[in-house]
A protein has these predicted regions:
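Conserved phosphate-binding elements of NTP-dependent enzyme cores
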Residues: 1-839
């Protein structure tokens, strides 16, 4: 970036980091320019996020919060001080995390982007309101804004117009039937009697058995229903009693399950539908809800039609439509509609309407620049992809027009098609133009090439990383011989990691054929997935990739494998030979520090048994269970096996420190005395706490004589996870690391009956890591598996056997299969947006 003015020697133009030791950082000293776009690159586990989030963001946010009063700080969750000697000149910091939290059931695109605030205000202030006395519409006026009553021209009655909060489905405007969720759960009658060849006595009405209402069989017989004939032979009248019979008392003779005792009981009849409804009301925990859920089906609320709004909230009209109809529009459509609102109002109302509309348009402008114009305002927040949620978060930050803030972004290119990269860079440039600084952790070479300054961490992952390999301008880093990202930035190197299947041989192993009706933005379509191949599903944001794969293909395959009915929108599925579908996502593994790499992959069980067989363990009476740091006798009594203790410092955030007694090993002193003889080693080897402190690669030689443990660790090494420590807590792993760890149990076994589905597995991966990942997928394919990947990474797509490209645009402009074939065939298709970047 060119500087138009001479540099002021007294002006602070960089952040100074000295002695950073967060996670695997090795006393890193680095200067980060202020007022510039700074990219942080490096292989997975090299320390990128540790530097950006663990040091820069942690210190920037902590120091800002320290300026607040102690009373205020007590009410704010605070991060502890980073493990760093000194950080100077760091501004107040905001972080846009790699994976924003999945919103709750009440969140929509409109609420999370705050667009609905302006829209509700518009309908409240300038809408034509409904008279509650006669139902007539009252022409728009300034009375609502002036807090004056409205006068109905039809009946002359006065009433108060609704405020913006009374039009919100999260408060006063919620539909009373569904509570503002838009969804109603009804009993699925087909699930109540899945096998009509059985009689009621044989358990045809499964709900009476599984929900502990076995007596209902006898009561049903007392109601006049034949219980000893197949259900399919019952008359319509008998079926009506089973499903909808009245709650009448009947006298029955009940035989105890044990013994020959009989008892006479007067029992009220609960028909099959009421049994489910009653159990749903009484369900107090997740287990109870799960037991009932299989008899329920979710659908749009019958009263509000899925709009979430009450009848009163749907009353006000603007330009002839109500609030529910306005939220059903896409953002593109809503902006065009909003532009015409002021001119249709009386002259005295136009300035107020123009102000509200401008507020809406300014919020929408950033979202449109980030390629989200295809989303409807009522789109459920939980159905948004990770990339969509992150871009909504980014748009909110930019809209605030702050200055002097350090924005730290973790993988801002998540979910972003190459066609949307320019919009993202434009937003980051706007932040800098407002006087802010941006530090972004990313792997996309197009994003990194646009940075003013690059910092590359490495050279390897874990203990082999944590140092600054190269830094400077893009050209400087590209020319640095030590840089691993340099050859990819300069175009001298491309990702090529696997042999691809020839087009003529693509369907030699069979195919999965899928036909579906419309869902969300996806139109009716049919698609063929070649079995035993690596398949990439591509397309711009909102083109329907997630809907096709995660909401159609995966549930359809799961239902077929379980022998259950296909989802309602799936018209046909031919997946002969497929009995398993594995969705491998990047959600964190476990929620607390007790879950570690060793426990998740199962190697700790093998190690505990091995140490329990030693002479020292036998003499002390230790069993395998005693070597568990969760429940065993050998766990540290001070930290209870967590490896950490929390210090309560009043007015300051709790400080988690390594347990001083076990030094974070999780084991008590006695465990260190149990050592195991190792193959080819003189004397005794390591204790279990010492072994757990090693990386996977370091531990492999120490378990050479333990076949099961060795194979599990070798698999982790082959997955590119050899740098992980056995005792490392799994919630701290990155999304890519979590995905590969979940695959560990699947490697090395036949997979011809399996389909593996991945949603953007290259998130956070350096081009070298992408090569490793492609090698992992090739192993699955070699074992017979079909691997389906939703992906934007062009290097990955170019290495796929088959590409299904959705589009051509997002939202209403997409939703169909534009092209399918080999990467070369898709690149040759003029309608394919992805193809333009593959060519």
């Amino acid at each position: 970036m060119e500087k138009s003015q001479a540099k002021d020697p007294d002006r602070i133009d960089h952040i100074e980091v000295r002695g950073a030791r967060v996670h695997n950082l090795k006393n890193v000293n680095v200067d980060i320019p202020l007022g510039e776009l700074v990219g942080v690159a490096g292989v997975s586990g090299s320390g990128k996020s540790s530097l950006a989030l663990g040091v820069l963001y942690a210190e920037g946010s902590r120091r800002y919060l320290e300026a607040l009063s102690t009373y205020t700080r007590r009410r704010i969750s605070q991060a502890g001080k980073a493990a760093v000697d000194d950080v100077r000149y760091v501004p107040a910091a905001l972080a846009l995390h790699q994976r924003p939290a999945v919103p709750g059931v009440r969140s929509t695109f409109g609420t999370s982007s705050e667009l609905l605030n302006s829209l509700r205000l518009l309908f409240s202030r300038v809408g034509s309101h409904v008279c509650p006395h006669c139902g007539a519409h009252v022409p728009p006026s300034l009375n609502v804004a002036a807090e004056l009553p409205l006068v109905c021209p039809a009946c002359g009655q006065k009433f108060r117009g609704p405020g913006a909060e009374e039009l919100a489905f999260n408060s006063g405007g919620a539909c009373p039937t569904c509570g503002g969720t838009g969804v109603a759960r009804t009993v699925n009658r087909a699930a109540l009697v899945p096998d009509e060849s059985k009689s009621i006595d044989e358990g045809a009405v499964v709900v009476w058995g599984s929900l502990m209402w076995d007596l209902m069989k006898q009561v049903c017989g007392a109601m006049g229903v034949r219980t000893n004939v197949p259900f399919c032979e019952l008359t319509p009248e008998e079926r009506a009693i089973v499903f909808d019979g009245p709650a009448e008392k009947r006298h029955i003779l009940y035989k105890a399950k044990k013994g020959d005792n009989f008892a006479e009981l007067d029992f009220t009849y609960f028909n099959a539908v009421r049994t489910v409804e009653n159990s749903l009301v009484k369900a107090k925990d997740e287990k109870g809800l799960k037991r009932v859920a299989k008899f329920l089906v979710e659908g749009p609320c019958p009263d509000c039609g899925g709009t979430r709004l009450s009848a009163a909230a749907r009353g006000p009209l603007v330009r002839g439509i109500n609030l529910a109809e306005a939220t059903q529009m896409t953002l593109d459509e809503a902006c065009a509609w909003m532009a015409g609102v002021p001119e249709g109002l009386p002259a005295e109302m136009r300035p107020m309407a123009a102000s509200i509309c401008e507020s809406f348009q300014s919020t929408a402008r950033r979202l449109l620049e980030l390629g989200l114009g295809y989303l409807s305002l009522d789109r459920a927040g939980s159905t948004l992809s990770t990339g969509e949620r992150q871009r909504v978060q980014l748009a909110r930050s930019v809209r605030n027009r702050t200055t002097g803030v350090l924005y730290v972004m973790d993988e801002p290119s998540i979910g972003l098609h190459p066609a949307n990269v320019d919009g993202l860079l434009g937003v980051m440039r706007d932040l800098i133009a407002d006087g802010n600084s941006v530090v972004m952790v990313d792997h996309d070479t197009r994003i990194l090439a646009a940075a003013d300054h690059l910092v590359e961490m490495g050279p390897a992952a874990g203990a082999g990383g944590g140092t600054v390999v190269a830094q400077g301008g893009v050209d400087e880093v590209a020319a640095c011989p030590e840089s691993l990202i340099g050859p990819y930035l300069s175009g001298k190197k491309r990702v090529e990691a696997r042999p691809r299947t020839a087009a003529d041989d693509m369907f030699d192993l069979g195919r999965i054929h899928l036909e579906s009706s419309g869902l969300h933005t996806v139109r009716p379509l049919c698609a063929d997935v070649p079995k035993g191949r690596l398949v990439a599903v591509t397309g711009v944001s909102g083109s329907g990739k997630t809907t096709l794969v995660l909401e159609t293909l995966v549930p359809a395959l799961a239902a077929a494998a379980a022998g259950e009915p296909l989802p309602a929108h799936v018209m046909a599925l031919d997946a002969a030979g497929v009995s398993r579908v594995n969705l491998v996502d990047a959600t964190p593994i476990g929620t607390n520090v007790r879950s570690t790499v060793a426990t998740y992959c199962g190697v700790l069980d093998d190690l505990r048994r091995a140490y329990a067989r030693t002479d020292a363990a036998r003499e002390a009476g230790y069993k395998a269970g005693d070597f568990s740091y969760n429940t065993g006798r050998l766990r540290c009594p001070i930290c209870d096996g967590t490896g950490q203790i929390s210090l309560d410092v009043q007015f300051l955030p709790d400080v988690d420190i390594d347990c001083p007694d076990c030094r974070a090993s999780r084991y008590g002193a006695a465990a260190a005395g149990v050592r195991r003889a190792e193959k080819g080693a003189d004397g005794l080897g390591l204790s279990l706490p010492e072994l757990m402190a090693l990386s996977v690669d370091e531990a492999l030689p120490h378990v050479a004589d333990l076949k099961r443990a060795r194979e599990k660790l070798q698999t982790l090494h082959d997955l590119g996870l050899g740098y992980l420590t056995l005792g490392e807590a799994t919630p701290a792993l990155s999304g890519g690391e979590a995905q590969r760890l979940k695959l560990a149990s699947e490697m090395g076994r036949g997979q011809a009956d399996a389909v593996f589905v991945f949603d953007e597995p290259t998130i956070g991966l350096h081009p070298r890591d992408v090569e490793t990942l492609l090698g992992v997928f090739q192993r699955l394919v070699d074992q017979g598996a079909t691997v389906v990947v939703v992906e934007h990474d062009l290097d990955f797509i170019a290495n796929a056997d088959w590409v299904i490209d959705m589009g051509p645009g997002g939202g209403e402009a997409g939703g169909r299969v534009v092209a399918c074939g080999t990467p070369e065939q898709v690149a040759a298709c003029p309608q394919s947006v992805t193809g333009r970047y593959l060519g």
